[in-house]
Regions:
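Small beta-barrel nucleic-acid-binding modules, primarily SNase/OB-fold domains
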Residues: 2-5, 10-158
Length: 158
């Protein structure tokens, strides 16, 4: 019985662990989606976890994409990922020189913290992302210059 319990717990730990991929950013599609080319010359479409950036036709959509491009285009990145979304994209946290690019998009006011997927984040990351969004809102950075910016999850339902 104990052995079974230990085996079950070990398998759960394995599920929760993130996989990692590294490569160079070869495309920035919008403020929360990129393509990474790994050392085997395989392209991976990456959806930045924990954030939702304005759609391209929304206010700040092109600025969000440009900000992300400035941060990571043609740079070496590491992606810590745990799953694929329904579109086949790898969902993960993108790191450049150890810095969380997803968080930087929120901090710059170029994306919302995506509360719908907060359960996928650690408690520490939830606090960081929430604080970054609140700080950007208070400072009226990026999309927060508008009093009530329309979030992309509502815009997509139109």
């Amino acid at each position: 019985m104990r052995l079974w319990l230990v085996a079950a717990l070990c398998s759960l730990v394995g599920i929760a662990q993130a996989d990692t991929l590294s490569g160079r950013v070869v495309a920035v599609h919008d403020g929360d989606t990129i393509t990474v080319l790994d050392t085997n010359r395989t392209q991976h479409k990456i959806r930045l976890a924990g954030i939702d950036a304005p759609e391209f036709k929304q206010a700040f959509g092109s600025r969000s994409k440009q900000n992300l491009s400035n941060l990571i285009y043609n740079r070496q990145v590491t992606v810590d990922w745990q799953k694929h979304d329904r579109y086949g994209r790898t969902v993960g946290v993108v790191l450049v020189d150890g810095h969380d690019v997803n968080l930087e998009q929120v901090r710059a006011g170029m994306a919302w913290w995506y509360r719908q997927y907060a359960r996928d984040q650690s408690p520490a990351d939830r606090r960081l992302y929430e604080a970054a969004e609140n700080d950007a809102r208070t400072a009226k950075r990026g999309l927060w210059v508008d009093a009530n910016p329309g979030p992309p999850w509502k815009w997509r339902r139109r």
